[in-house]
Amino acid sequence: MATAAVATRRPGPGDRARRWASGFRERDTWWAYAFLVPWAFGFVVFTAGAMVWGAIISFTNYSVVAPSHSVGLANYRQIASDPYALLSLKNSFEMTAIYVPFEMGLALLFASMLARVTRFDGFFRTVYYLPVMTPTVAIGGMYLLMFNGPYGLVDQFLGYLHIPEPYWLTDPNWIKPGIAAMLVWQVGGNTVLYLAAIKNVPQQLYEAASIDGASAWRRFKDVTLPMISPTLFFTFVILTVYGLQVFDQIYTAFYNPSNAKISSDTSLMYVIYLFQQAFDYLHMGFASAMAWLLFGIIMVITAFQILVSKRFVYYEGEQR
Amino acid sequence: MSRRWKAIGAFAIAGVVAAIAVTAAAAHSSSKHSTTFSGTLNIMGFGTNGDDVAKNRFAIAQKAVAPAKVNAPNGGFNEQQFLTDIASKQVPDLVYWDRSYVGTYAAKGALMPLDSCIKSDKIDTSQYRQAALQSVTYNGHIYGIPEFFDVRTLIVDTHVADTSGVTGKMLNTANPTVLKQAALKMYQHSGSQVTRIGFDPKLPEFFPLWAKAFGANILSKDGLHPDLNSPQAIAALTYANSLIQAQGGYNAFLAFRNTWDFFGSDNQVAKNQVGAWPMEEWYYNVLASSSPNVNVTAIPFRSKTGDPINYSTGSAWSIPKGAKNAAAACQWMKTMTNASTWETVANIRKAAYAKAGQYWTGLFTANSKADAAINKPTSGEPKKWASIINTVEAAEKYSFALPASPASAQFNTAWTNAVNRVLQGQQSPTQALNQAQKEAVAAIKQATKK
């Protein structure tokens, strides 16, 4: 009886601590921690530390250059009444709503094409991935050339197809789609992820579907998509976060001091406005409040995505 | 000997001459001060990789503060780095930046007022142009020593003007109706695409110039009271915007302008892609070096009253509060901006240009004494370049600048956004400038709140 009682007892905190401490008798444990320390140090100092500091100054009127004092929740209240903060948040949401499906759709298309390539597949994977290596600032600069009215490379291509060329840089109706198109330049990263996921789909599932008379579209819809849904979900979350936080390319294209002539209310994204508040206007406290608000918004969106994903994402081997 | 080797030889000789001149100028400069400098002078925003004028002045100023060492990393002023330096209480001794920064940082107490520096080093402030001084003066104190001085005149492609039947008299900003007619005469298009801009008003950048030309002062002299939505400012924006809308509309206009090879030999003047536009004086130097045979002239920008006006911007030197080597910083600023230094480096450049067969198009500084001495056409120079130097030099006298403001960046953003909203057809000039006025008032109020 006593033995049975011990066997069914759930391990308490003391047990877990003893087990953790006993791990240090192993040499490998020390090595593992040795490798983790640099990352942990970087995280504490440059991420967690900065976040905590940001949270503190979000309740002050800190400007770096002048003495600061506590302002309570004033910065957070000011965000709600600042028309540019709200406008930039709306712009970021709209641009992300265009960008994420566009990027995922294109990456899936490219991955599906690459999955069929059997010769020189390594070469093609490299070619598709190469644009990911382009510095983001260079992408912003190239955007101005490639999307310049009827003269840019993209517009000339559209003209060749007899599609009217939009003024991506200056027409308020086309600025956000243009920015989304610019971000898709780095689609190769997700293409490679999707390709790996597609290659992992068991062939027998396709064979069984074919025997049942499923068309190529049904095989894709009912076999490929469910089987790669964890990867799709992962990229969906990551791209949403990226879309809401993207800065470099848009700043280079529209807000570089020499390009101020094309900045507009439509191109003003939330993180750009946050940067202006912090480093152009020296409103560090307000900018920190904006950063924490964005963090909260992203957390809520991610939690919602995870909740919804339970209906759509299939994890192989998962017990339901 | 090939032309290439001749040019290399010319520059080598010019280099030797420069070394001798710089040494002499430094000896001249250092003989005037009795203070012994020590330690290191840390400079932000002015490195050693600039052009010949920057390098030669650097050498002169370096000798003037010797035996103090000079630490001047390459790269322009970096606001983020500067803020980090302030936060860590490790400020540079000297910053070289755009004059528009001065008011904001002065208002927040991050800069040293230069009264004692000016007094102790006997810096003659009367040599600096009033417009430049105004943009570095906040609350009655000078916080920066002005250096370069941008002069904006109309650059005219005379080939385009002549072949379009446009005379110099028609390109008169004092007469908006005739100017618009001239713009449309020079403007060309193919369907909806612009193939030549007749007259580019340079919006949004030059809105302050247009506003002033129409009689508006968009910011009070103390930098605390914006007046962006005055009837004159609204009229100015309405007119300047109408010039663009009449020449294909903003989208087509800007898309075409973005195709220009601005710094190359196939620039918009060389290819006759523009009739006229207001521009800073440094662009004449670009034209003289990249396409010296272009048909170009300069015309002063005039206000509606017919008087020439110039919207001036430029750079300045300032000493952050907490600088450890303020004495050397003060001497450095004085040396970099005094007339003898400018004359020395200008003479070196003139000699180098003459030997290389390049045309002298002037060097325009915030020091009026220096400009009077150096901005004279060189002998044997083609008339067009000589005439341009004279026009720019004359325009300098009619300069205004936006006063130092505690919220310069927000003020500039407010009117830039307003102009862009008008250009993109999102608001009327009245709506846009009313909004800009509200934003500017709120920004300055917040910046001055204790």
Predicted regions and their residues:
Chain B
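Conserved N-terminal structural module of periplasmic/extracytoplasmic solute-binding proteins
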Residues: 2-104, 119-126, 305, 340-344, ...
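A local structural motif
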Residues: 64-74, 90-91, 165-171, 221-225, ...
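Short helix-initiation/N-cap motifs at beta->coil->alpha
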Residues: 73-82, 100, 174-178, 254-267, ...
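Short helices/loops that flank or line small-molecule/ion binding pockets
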Residues: 80-91, 108, 160-161, 180-189, ...
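Hinge/lid segment of periplasmic solute-binding proteins
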Residues: 100-152, 178-182, 297-299, 382-383
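Helix-loop-helix "hinge/cap" segment bordering the ligand-binding cleft or interdomain interface
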Residues: 118-119, 137-206, 216-254, 321-327, ...
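Extracytoplasmic/periplasmic substrate-binding proteins
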Residues: 206-209, 214, 237-335
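C-terminal lobe and pocket-closing loops
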Residues: 283-293, 306-312, 318-413
